[in-house]
Amino acid sequence: MKCTKCGKPASVKLRHYNIKLCKEHFNEFIEQRVEKAIKKFKMFGRNSKILIAVSGGKDSVSLWHMLKKLGYEVDALFIRAGKSGMVQKAQEIVEKNAELLNTKLHIVDATEYFGGLSTQEISIMLRRPVCSICGVVRRYLMNKFAYENGYDVVVTGHNLNDEASVLLGNILHWQEGYLERQWPLLPKTHEKLVPKAKPLVLNYEEDIKLYATLNEIPHLEMACPFSVGATSLVYKKILRELEEEQPGITLNFYLGFLKRKKEPKFEVEGLRECKECGYPTTAEVCSFCRLRKQVEKRKNKTPA
């Protein structure tokens, strides 16, 4: 098997692009697709103050390495939402990558906002899915940190499979509001909302995994145990099966949506500032502050 670009022995075969590549040209190919996404969707510039949210997983840490390699100045943020051994391992991996990249790493402990409780403990207390609580907490703290520290954009490791599965779910349920706003870049719609960008949207998840492996990038091998049973995994499975039969269909599906889409509508009706914390919300009190109140109320009811 020879590299399509140079004729040297190939390291990988990418069925969805019908090409075979050596390690050097594979890296170049993946990195160029990241650069293409950044420029095509006007995510940020060379002088932007960029904050990447890292979890320790293959996507965020690989993107971290790519952005540094492409010449962008990037600081990283790790939100510690639990106390488990996996969370500790994730933090160690993130710290190792920060050392390798000589990059500033910020760590925010989410449990400090909930009297020391992890998202898992809050989930049990309130009888709500962990993913729901974790999402609320991470989105809020990510934006809060970025805004208060003057960052121009927050970057996340969402890949093509992530975005295509969300798109499929939104179409199947006719979530018109979400379909209107789904885009690789969410611009600023309020002074206290920092833009969010997804530079990996043109890259398949399996290619990011290959990139991390070939380049020996430290990352968590296992997925979050609480994601088991998530609806998004059902949509990903459907797309994987389609991809087996028709290589490239996931990319065509997502790009077709972006190409045919009219100007995205990012404005959110009724956006105002939370009366508790002052951050944007569509309700009187934002979901993060409501969550804090619910936890505080439940803790006060629990006998010592």
From Swiss-Prot:
One of its GO terms (biological process) is tRNA wobble position uridine thiolation. CDD domains: TtuA-like (cd01993). GO terms for cellular component: cytosolic tRNA wobble base thiouridylase complex. The keyword Iron-sulfur applies. It is an enzyme of class 2 (transferase). Binds 1 [4Fe-4S] cluster per subunit. The cluster is chelated by three Cys residues, the fourth Fe with a free coordination site may bind a small ligand, such as exogenous sulfide, thus acting as a sulfur carrier. [4Fe-4S] cluster binds at residues 131, 134, 224. Its EC number is 2.8.1.-. Zn(2+) 1 binds at residues 3, 6, 22, 25. SUPFAM superfamilies: Adenine nucleotide alpha hydrolases-like (SSF52402). InterPro entries: Rossmann-like_a/b/a_fold, TilS/TtcA_N, tRNA_thiolation_TtcA_Ctu1, TtuA-like_LIM_N, UPF0021_CS. The keyword ATP-binding applies. ATP binds at residues 53, 79, 138, 157. Homodimer. In TtuA from T.thermophilus, the sulfur inserted into the nucleoside comes from the C-terminal thiocarboxylate of TtuB, but there is no TtuB ortholog in T.maritima. This is tRNA-5-methyluridine(54) 2-sulfurtransferase. The gene is ttuA.
